[in-house]
Amino acid sequence: MELNSIKPADGAKHAARRVGRGIGSGLGKTAGRGHKGQKSRSGGYHKVGFEGGQMPLQRRLPKRGFKSHLLKFNAEISLTALENLGLAEVDVLALKNAGLVGELAKVVKVIKSGEISKAVKLSGITATAGAKAAIEAAGGSLA
């Protein structure tokens, strides 16, 4: 077998149906769209969510919550990412330089996701209770 000899099995591919090309084709004149009506016109279809004038579901349901504008200043980093960073001392600037947190991040929190075996000293970074225990068990510290 060679790459240039690979082809689909017989009958696997169907030719595209050419519509609107004369009565002999069986799909001439109205091209399978029937007579008149919105769906027979070009561009004739309702927008997504339109329910024929009835109040759409998206507007019937109540609004809930809001998106905090502070989220862009907060960042999370996993224990695995901290381990792979390979630095003995880590601060927010080091994480920004490594591309692990965004440029706007002001508060960084380590979450317990994965494992850590190297001793890492964190400064200016917070951690969850589980992550703190894992870092200290590996010989690291939080300042």
From Swiss-Prot:
<keyword id="KW-0689">Ribosomal protein</keyword>
<dbReference type="Pfam" id="PF00828">
    <property type="entry name" value="Ribosomal_L27A"/>
</dbReference>
<dbReference type="GO" id="GO:0003735">
    <property type="term" value="F:structural constituent of ribosome"/>
</dbReference>
<comment type="subunit">
    <text>Part of the 50S ribosomal subunit.</text>
</comment>
<keyword id="KW-0699">rRNA-binding</keyword>
<comment type="function">
    <text>Binds to the 23S rRNA.</text>
</comment>
<keyword id="KW-0694">RNA-binding</keyword>
<keyword id="KW-0687">Ribonucleoprotein</keyword>
<dbReference type="InterPro" id="IPR036227">
    <property type="entry name" value="Ribosomal_uL15/eL18_sf"/>
</dbReference>
<feature type="region of interest" description="Disordered">
    <location>
        <begin position="1"/>
        <end position="54"/>
    </location>
</feature>
<dbReference type="GO" id="GO:0006412">
    <property type="term" value="P:translation"/>
</dbReference>
<feature type="compositionally biased region" description="Gly residues">
    <location>
        <begin position="21"/>
        <end position="31"/>
    </location>
</feature>
<dbReference type="InterPro" id="IPR030878">
    <property type="entry name" value="Ribosomal_uL15"/>
</dbReference>
<dbReference type="InterPro" id="IPR021131">
    <property type="entry name" value="Ribosomal_uL15/eL18"/>
</dbReference>
<dbReference type="GO" id="GO:0022625">
    <property type="term" value="C:cytosolic large ribosomal subunit"/>
</dbReference>
<comment type="similarity">
    <text>Belongs to the universal ribosomal protein uL15 family.</text>
</comment>
<dbReference type="InterPro" id="IPR005749">
    <property type="entry name" value="Ribosomal_uL15_bac-type"/>
</dbReference>
<protein>
    <recommendedName>
        <fullName>Large ribosomal subunit protein uL15</fullName>
    </recommendedName>
</protein>
<dbReference type="GO" id="GO:0019843">
    <property type="term" value="F:rRNA binding"/>
</dbReference>
